C-alpha cells in the first residue's frame, strides 16, 4: 500500500542518541492480529458497521484461492438457440472442470447474498480487500455482480495472498512477548469471505484513526487528494470522531493499540466503522510516518514529562541576610507567580486534541489522482488473458514470449556485427 512521508520529520531529543535500527513497536501478538480480523470484531460493532455478511470458508475453498492459475466456474446463463448449436462442438470436451463442485454450498451462499444485497457487493477476506486487483474488473473498482467477479478479484490480489500465506509475519506468541514465532505454532485462522452491500462511498469522507493506550492519538484522510471543503469542517469532524471513539470503541476493543477506519457521510452527523487494522508496520500510516506516530506523546506521556520537569530543583545555602533579601523578592513576585500557576492549571485542564492531518493544496500529494494506485501489482493484459484460458493458454503465451525474446536477441547480435 502507498506511503506518504510526513512534512514534520521527528527530531532526536539529543545529539547523543543512537540512531534507531528498527521502529519501536511493541511486540505484535497472534491474538492482536486475530482481534483485527473482520469475523472477530464485526459482531461486537454490528450496529455501527455497513451491512455485510461473513461467510465461513471451507478448506477446499481456501485451497482454491491458494492454487495457481485462475479457473472460474461456468457462468449461469439462460440457454439460447445459438448455444444449442455448439452443444456437440469439439471444444466441449476440453473445457476446464468446474472448481465450485468442491464447495457448492459456499458458491450458492455467495449467489444468495448478492441477491439479498440488491445485486451488487464488495468482497474482502479476514483483513484485506482486493483493492490491488480492481484493474481486473470491468468497472475498475470492487463492485461485484456475480460470484465469478468475486473469485477473479480474490485470486488476482496480492493483498489476499498475504492474508492467506503470511497473516502472522513478525508476530510473537501471546504467552511470552519475548519469544519468537518459531517457539510456538501459529494459530489456525478461521477464514471468512466478507461481502458488503455495495455503497458508492465518497472517498473524501473516509478517515484513518490511530489509537495508542486507548487514546485517539491522531487521524488523517484516507484518500490522498486535496479536498478544500474538508478544512472548515476539520474541528467538527474531529469532535464527531472523538465522541464516536469514546462511546463505541475505547473500552470495548480487546487491545489498547489499534488503527480503525471510519466513514462520515453527509450531513456528517453519523460515523460508520469501516475497518479495524493492527497496530503494526503492515498497516499503512498514510499521511503520517510510523516513526512519527510512535514518538507522539499522548496525555499520559505529556503528564509524565511535566512531572519529570517539576522534580528538577536547585538547593541553595543561604545566610541570614541573604534569606531576608530573598524573602522580600519572593513576596514581590508572589502575585505574578500565582497568576502563572492559574494559567498553567487552566492549560492542564484543556482536553487533549488528536492531530487531524489533511492534504493541503500545495502538498505534493494533492493531485495523486493522476497516479494509478497499486500499479506495482498490475500485469499486462496479454498475461491476464493467457491465465484465464487455463494452463494451455499460459504455456502458449510463454512459448510466444520466448520466441520474441530470441528474435530480439538475434536482431541485436546482427546490429553489433554490422557495426
UniProtKB/Swiss-Prot annotation:
Belongs to the CDC123 family. GO terms for biological process: cell division. This is Cell division cycle protein 123. Residues 78-99, 328-350 have a biased composition (Acidic residues). Residues 7-18 have a biased composition (Polar residues). Keywords: Cell cycle, Cell division, Cytoplasm. Pfam families: D123. One of its GO terms (cellular component) is cytoplasm. The keyword Acetylation does not apply. It is found in: Cytoplasm. Regulates the cell cycle in a nutrient dependent manner. It comes from the Eukaryota. Residues 1-23, 73-102, 328-351 are annotated as: Disordered.
Amino acid at each position: 500500500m502507498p506511503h506518504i512521508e510526513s512534512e514534520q520529520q521527528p527530531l532526536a531529543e539529543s545529539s547523543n542518541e543512537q540512531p534507531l535500527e528498527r521502529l519501536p513497536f511493541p511486540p505484535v501478538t497472534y491474538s492482536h492480529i486475530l482481534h483485527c480480523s473482520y469475523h472477530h470484531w464485526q459482531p461486537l460493532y454490528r450496529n455501527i458497521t455497513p451491512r455485510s455478511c461473513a461467510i465461513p470458508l471451507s478448506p477446499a475453498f481456501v485451497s482454491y484461492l491458494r492454487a495457481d492459475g485462475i479457473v472460474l466456474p461456468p457462468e449461469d446463463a439462460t440457454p439460447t438457440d445459438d448455444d444449442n448449436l455448439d452443444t456437440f462442438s469439439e471444444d466441449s470436451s476440453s473445457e476446464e472442470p468446474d472448481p465450485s463442485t468442491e464447495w457448492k454450498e459456499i458458491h450458492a451462499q455467495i449467489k444468495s447474498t448478492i441477491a439479498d444485497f440488491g445485486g451488487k457487493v464488495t468482497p474482502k477476506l479476514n483483513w484485506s480487500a482486493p483493492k490491488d486487483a480492481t484493474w481486473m474488473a470491468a468497472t475498475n473498482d470492487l463492485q461485484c455482480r456475480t460470484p465469478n467477479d468475486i473469485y477473479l478479484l480474490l485470486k488476482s490480489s496480492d493483498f489476499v495472498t498475504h492474508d492467506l500465506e503470511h497473516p502472522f509475519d513478525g508476530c510473537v506468541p501471546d504467552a511470552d512477548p519475548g519469544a519468537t514465532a518459531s517457539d510456538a505454532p501459529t494459530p489456525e485462522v478461521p477464514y471468512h469471505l466478507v461481502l458488503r452491500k455495495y455503497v458508492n462511498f465518497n472517498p473524501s469522507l473516509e478517515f484513518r484513526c490511530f489509537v495508542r493506550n486507548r487514546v485517539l492519538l491522531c487521524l488523517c484522510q484516507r484518500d490522498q487528494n486535496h479536498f478544500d471543503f474538508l478544512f472548515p469542517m476539520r474541528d467538527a469532524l474531529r469532535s464527531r470522531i472523538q465522541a464516536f471513539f469514546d462511546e463505541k470503541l475505547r473500552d470495548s476493543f480487546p487491545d489498547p493499540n489499534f488503527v480503525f477506519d471510519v466513514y462520515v457521510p453527509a450531513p456528517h452527523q453519523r460515523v460508520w466503522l469501516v475497518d479495524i487494522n493492527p497496530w503494526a508496520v503492515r498497516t499503512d500510516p498514510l499521511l503520517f510516518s510510523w516513526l512519527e506516530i510512535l514518538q507522539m506523546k499522548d496525555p499520559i506521556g505529556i503528564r509524565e514529562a511535566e512531572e519529570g520537569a517539576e522534580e528538577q530543583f536547585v538547593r541553595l545555602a543561604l545566610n541570614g541576610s541573604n534569606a531576608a533579601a530573598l524573602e522580600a523578592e519572593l513576596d514581590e513576585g508572589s502575585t505574578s507567580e500565582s497568576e502563572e500557576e492559574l494559567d498553567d492549571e487552566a492549560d492542564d485542564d484543556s482536553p487533549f486534541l488528536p492531530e487531524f492531518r489533511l492534504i493541503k493544496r500545495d502538498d505534493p500529494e494533492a493531485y495523486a489522482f493522476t497516479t494509478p494506485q497499486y500499479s506495482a501489482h498490475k500485469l499486462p493484459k496479454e498475461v491476464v488473458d493467457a491465465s484465464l484460458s487455463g494452463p494451455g493458454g499460459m504455456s502458449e503465451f510463454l512459448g510466444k514470449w520466448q520466441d520474441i525474446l530470441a528474435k530480439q536477441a538475434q536482431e541485436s547480435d546482427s546490429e553489433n556485427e554490422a557495426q
